[in-house]
Amino acid sequence: MRIIDSIPHESMTISIFQMNDKYQVRFEAGPMEQTFKFTLEEVKSLENLKTKINAEFIEATRKRFNEMFVQMRDI
């Protein structure tokens, strides 16, 4: 697996990896991580993948991180 691109964001690290016939988009915020997997067949190209990872997708991921932080804090 190798990193092929990243998406700039002020509060998360967003990295795009490629391995065999899949892309993985990894979001990292503090001790939390979320990874989304896409096949090349689904997205066709890196450019198409990056259009799927739009502001709405990123915001939903950020909200999920907030839920994860609360859950971890309350353990």
Language-model-detected regions and their locations in the chain:
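A mid-sequence interfacial segment
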Residues: 9, 40-43
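Mixed-charge, Lys/Arg-enriched low-complexity segments
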Residues: 42-75
